[in-house]
Amino acid sequence: MITILDYGAGNLFSVQNALNFLGVENNISSKVEDIISADKLILPGVGAFPDAMKMLDEAGLTEVIKEQAKKKALMGICLGMQMLFDKSYEFGETEGLGLIPGTVELMHPANDLVIPHIGWNSLEKNEPCKLLESVNDGDYVYFVHSYAAVTDSKNVAAYCDYGMKVPALVMSGNVYGCQFHPEKSGKTGLGILKTFASL
């Protein structure tokens, strides 16, 4: 069972639809008992980092997520991926979950590329990662973001190029993060979700 975490700032149903399409058992919940009993967790997220962290705290989920991430696989998606890091500088400075070392900062792409970075972009593999077993260099996935992770290369399974090297898929222990939306990324994204479900 994969539990999709419901804290008020996630694109829950598109993720659930993708898992349902794959035949993966899942639920959407904010209940601590469901999070504890789940085999794996997905932390979706849309919007602003400070608001999302506040909602996660107010839902009483911050500490249980940190604890469960030591025991089971966790995937953060888009803003949910950014929340895995130590802190973000979006609208000031806000502490994150601290599950992957690094920060989240406004992108400064070269060549006057506009932000937000919206659309399809190709993945460039970096460090070995189980989630990329079905993915080839150059496969395209779908992005929507203005901020990006700043972290050691050893934590980056794949980058994309958007006038700068953008960490697209990050990892640390049981914790994985997709800056892109796997649930909106066609065959490539579904393959990543299927592999995550089978970990």
Residue ranges of predicted features:
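N-terminal beta1-alpha1 ligand-phosphate binding loop
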Residues: 2-24, 180-185
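Short, surface-exposed beta-strand/loop micro-motifs that present aromatic residues
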Residues: 165-171
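Pocket-forming structural segment of enzyme catalytic cores
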Residues: 86-164
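Acyltransferase
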Residues: 178-199
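Short acidic low-complexity segments
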Residues: 26-37
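Short, Asp-centered acidic motifs that coordinate Mg2+ and/or phosphate
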Residues: 40
